[in-house]
Structures are given as C-alpha cells and as structure tokens.
Amino acid sequence: DRINALHDSFLKAIKTYKYKNIYQGVFPVKCNQQKNVLEKIIEFGSQWNFGLEVGSKSELLIGLALLENQNSLLICNGYKDKKYIEIATLARKLGKNPIIVIEQRDEVKRIIQAVQELNATPLIGIRAKLSSKSSGRWGKSIGDNSKFGLSIPEIMLTIKELKEANLINEMKLLHFHIGSQISDIAVIKDALQEASQ
C-alpha cells in the first residue's frame, strides 16, 4: 500500500511538472532484512521496477539473490572493499543493475582496478557532500561535517579519472543526504539547487 502511494505521488508530480524521466524507488535492506518482507516488497514493487539499496557485502548478496527483475536498481552504498566492488561489477554480466555509489575517494581506484581485472563495467554513482543541511535529527552529521560523500573538488577529480578510464558514460546517479525529519521545504529546495549546479 505504501509503495503504491509513493509511486502514485511521484507519478502525479511527474505529470504535473512535465518531468521527462521516471521515478524508480528502492527499499533500504538495512531497514528490514527479513526474507519474507523483502520478497513481498520486491513482488509488489515489480510493476514499477522497484529495487533495493544495500550497504554491505552481505546485503549485496541478498539483493542479487532476490532481485530478478533486470530493470530494477540495486543501489550499492556503504564501505566498499575490493570484494564488494568485484561482486557488484560482475553482477552486470548477469544482467543485474547494481550502481556502485562512490562515497570515498579511494573507491574510485578500486572500481577502475576491478574493471581492468574483470573485463566488466559497473554502473556508477557519486554521493555528494552538500553544504545544505537541515536542523532535523541527523542535521549535524551531514553537510560539510559528513564522513560520507565527496566534496565539489573531489567530485571534479573523480569525474576526470572516470573520463580517463572511459567510465564516464557509466555514471548514472547523483546521491546526497540532507537529513531526516525535515520540517522546512526550503531545506529541500536549497539542496536540490546546490546539487543541480
């Protein structure tokens, strides 16, 4: 019911504002790792290509095992060692759509190395460290104080390295956090404006 309401809300906004793309949601596995819950979410959300967000190797393996819809996204966050990146990269050869989200600069080198060693190309995203933040519960752990995400200079360097490695066309996602329990719409507007620059 919630997935349906969420999808309908985005669909309505897409039509209202004549947005020229689609909404594709993902469920964070860390919120509930129970197999029966994840299977129901995937089953009900399959009509909209609803996917999963994972934050560890074990969650990645869960996502790869459960997601059969080749159009569903598998967003790969969290600490990414060599094995995590290799698994996500090889999953592309199996017709899956994992997007490895670069959250730390050292992950760029590991991704490029995996591409060279495995002769496979992952989809890539970048987590930006925005200056915009909220006063909500997690407001102090985001923005310039965040331990995750790349600053603007780091993003520019990452883009340069991805171009040099012929991976820039695999860049599919810009990811950022502005906190939770946001009570002022201006915070969201500021973050979107900053992210779009």
Please provide the spans of the model-predicted regions.
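Low-complexity, highly charged intrinsically disordered N-terminal segments
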Residues: 1-23, 28
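Active-site-proximal beta-alpha core segment in soluble small-molecule metabolic enzymes
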Residues: 23-196
